Amino acid sequence: MGRRWVLAIAGSVLLIGSCAEEQPEYLAVDYESWERTVASDLTEIVPGHGGGLRRIYINSIGTDAVLDDDGAIRYPDGTIIIKEAHTVTDSSDLEAPAALLGMVKAPGAEDARGGWIWVYRHVDDGTEEIFAEEYCITCHANANESHPYGEGNPRGAFRDFVFYPY
């Protein structure tokens, strides 16, 4: 009787575990076919992204961003922005990225901060981690005012948390 009980519990655990909802994969594998938000490679040091070269890609939904008369930019739901972070600063030495960082516009999502889900893909195994705390949004809020990166948003317009808008 004891062995049957153990087998029944083990079977139930396996059945319940197999029904668990998997976390969706947010960052597309084919992102390199997307448009880049900035044509050039970015090499200036940006806190939180390492000191190497960066390339930023945006999906086709994001290319329909709305630019208001006051310079504000709003990205449509479903926009995905992926930043490759490299360890080198010279594109002639470029290899696979050290990290992939992403923003997914999903204002209604439980894990969204500022209307975006902030994602880190581990390049070694392809798993993704959602930053549900305030780490990313705290820095990216600065994109909505004048800042020292790129063209600097001199008018301090709302940029939907994106430093290098499309």
Each model region followed by its residue ranges:
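Bacterial N-terminal signal peptides that target proteins for export
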Residues: M1-I9
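Short, intrinsically disordered low-complexity segments
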Residues: G2-R3, R54, F158
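Sequence context surrounding c-type heme c attachment/ligation sites in exported
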Residues: A20-Y31, G71-Y166
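N-terminal secretory signal peptides
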Residues: Y26-R74
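C-terminal motif of bacterial Sec signal peptides marking the signal peptidase cleavage site
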Residues: L15-S18
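Intrinsic disorder/low-complexity segments enriched in polar/charged and small flexible residues
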Residues: L7, R36, W118-Y120
